[in-house]
Amino acid sequence: MLVFAIDRYEDLAGSLGAETGRITRRLFPDGEHYLRVEDEVNDRDVVLVGGTVDHDATLELYDLACALVESGASTLTLIVPYFGYSTMERAVMPGESVMAKNRARMLSSIPRAKLGNQIVMLDLHSEGIPHYFEGTIRPFHVYAKPVIEQLARELGGASFILGSTDAGRAKWVESLANDLRVPAAFVYKRRLSGETTEVTAVSTALKGETVVIYDDMIRTGSSLINAGRAYREAGAGRLIAIATHGVFADDGARRVLASGLFDQVAVTDSHPNAQQEGVIVRSVAPLFAASVL
C-alpha cells in the first residue's frame, strides 16, 4: 500500500505507518496549480489523505485522486479527516446551495480505480452526509471516540462530569458519558445569527466539579466560550475543553485560551490548524490505520 497526502496533511499521512509517495507541486503566476505523482502506482493499493478544509484543499484532493486512478491504481482510498461544509448539509431557504451534498457528489465523480474507490471520514457533524455519495464509491464513517475517551480520562482525572456545548450534541455526549461511566450535563442555547449564540440554561447545578466539555469542532470558539461561562456560573470547578476538529477559524484558539475559562484545551490532528500554542493535540492516525491498512 502506498500513501499520498495533499498539502498540510503530510504529517498525518506519515503517521499511518505505511510507505509514503511523492508529489510535485508548482504554483504558476496566474494562480494555476501543477501536480504530478512521482511514484509508480499501477496495480497498487493507494491511499490519499486530505481534508476538505477549503477550496484549494478540496480541489487538490480531487485532482490528485484523479491522477492516481488514471495512473493505474488498483484501489483508491480517500482518508478525509475533516469534511468541510458538514454544517451545510441541508437547505433552509429557497435557492441555498447544499454545500456538503455538492462536495460528496464531487468526490463521487472521481474516476473508478480498477477495484473500486472508498472514502473514510471522521466524526461528521451530520450523520446523513455519507448518504449523499453517489455511484460506486463506498463511504465509511469512523468515530474518534477512543481518542476522545482517553483524553477525557487523562485530563478530567478520577471524577468529572461530561458536558455539551448545546442540546444538539446531547445524544452523542450522553452516549460518551455512559461509556465513560460519568454523569452528563447539557447547555441549552439559542442561535442569534450564523456565529452568535446565547445560553439559556444549564441542565444541572454544579458544586466545584470538574467539567469536561466535548464538541465535535471548535471554529471561532464562541459556542465553547459561552458554554464554558455558563458552566462556571453554574458552579463548575476545573473546565476542560475537548473537540475532535480544531478548526480555529478567526484566531479561535487564541480567543478560547484568552477567555481564561479553560484549564486545558485538547483536539485531534484532523485539521491542519490544530497545532496551536497552548493546545494539546492527539493523533487520529491509529484510527485510520486500523480502518484501511
Where are these predicted regions, by residue range?
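PRPP-associated nucleotide enzymes
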Residues: 1-293
